[in-house]
Amino acid sequence: MLPFFDSPSPMDIPLYQQLQLTPPSPKPDHHHHHHSTFFYYHHHPPPSPSFPSFPSPAAATIASPSPAMHPFMDLELEPHGQQLAAAEEDGAGGQGVDAGVPFGVDGAAAAAAARKDRHSKISTAGGMRDRRMRLSLDVARKFFALQDMLGFDKASKTVQWLLNMSKAAIREIMSDDASSVCEEDGSSSLSVDGKQQQHSNPADRGGGAGDHKGAAHGHSDGKKPAKPRRAAANPKPPRRLANAHPVPDKESRAKARERARERTKEKNRMRWVTLASAISVEAATAAAAAGEDKSPTSPSNNLNHSSSTNLVSTELEDGSSSTRHNGVGVSGGRMQEISAASEASDVIMAFANGGAYGDSGSYYLQQQHQQDQWELGGVVYANSRHYC
């Protein structure tokens, strides 16, 4: 396949050379079946050209055979075809990963599913919990030391061994919880004790059997038997019932009413003390003001003092009448605790001792007699009401 020298286009190549480059498609042979996708063509070598030919770069490019038309292409494509067929067979069997699906999609999803399945949570009485747990430093050291002594290669086996060895304690806790629930429900103590005994005996028997099995297992493996579990030195106190509050009886109600009456009396007494102290302060202030304005030799000073005393007595009479109409009674003898220096406080004390109008008449007569005389320089003179 050598073109003419300096040929401008491939169309100037002779026909037999063009047929050599692109041969016609032959008919399939029914007698000989070939397994490859390409057929071998038996052709004679081209005759040598009668004209001289010179090599050129364009001719070399055109003369280079195409990879698709190379007769040994079957040998190059056959391994790749076998790989595709094997991948398809693996994909049909469920073990293939590259069976026509990109790795970036299903590979990442499969890896995520595997990671999620490894750390899946479990449903417990307290909700969803993770299967992994974090141990403290001391517990982790003891745990792995026990695992090394037992010769286990997985932590779950060590935990299973611990659960098997503590069956008796677990059953005891379950029986205690059942008895506490029965007590909270209000059942009798005998039934609770009976149930507890019924639960505890099989637990002890089961625990003994478990300990025996564990000891036998330890002896068979050449390991030390586990020590029996000691009884608790300080048993748990029984739980208090929800309805353990005592019901109040008649005696407690009567005591409560008595305490309420005492509080009411104390409140009334403090009210009278406050009133007496206010009146005493007011009377002392008025007396001091009157003493500054007038000399002590003037008899009108005593008149002012007596008039203020009469005013205080009138106010107390009005207050006592209103108290008597309202039904407020003050017990006699309580106001004796009040110590006052003025006449107003003396009037309050007399009113508290009497508690009514009839008992306070003698006190008013005594006050009237004291008002009729006044003292000057250690000498008591009779007070004249008509003195101006």
UniProtKB/Swiss-Prot annotation:
Superkingdom, taxonomy of origin: Eukaryota
Keyword hit for DNA-binding: yes
GO molecular function, one term: DNA-binding transcription factor activity
Protein localization: Nucleus
Record's compositionally biased regions (Polar residues): 187-201
R domain: residues covered: 250-267
Keywords: DNA-binding, Growth regulation, Nucleus, Transcription, Transcription regulation
Entry's Gene Ontology BP terms: regulation of secondary shoot formation; regulation of shoot system development
Effects seen without this gene: Increased lateral branching.
Extent of Basic and acidic residues compositional bias: 210-224, 247-269
Residue span of region Disordered: 180-269, 289-331
Assembly and binders: Interacts with MADS57.
Biological role stated in the UniProt entry: Probable transcription factor that functions as a negative regulator of lateral branching, presumably through its expression in axillary buds. Involved in the fine tuning of shoot branching. May function as an integrator of multiple signaling pathways to regulate the development of axillary buds. Works partially downstream of strigolactones to inhibit bud outgrowth. Binds to MADS57 to suppress the negative regulation of D14 by MADS57 and balance the expression of D14 for tillering.
Stated name of the protein: Transcription factor TB1
Species per Swiss-Prot/TrEMBL record: Oryza sativa subsp. japonica
Encoding gene (name): TB1
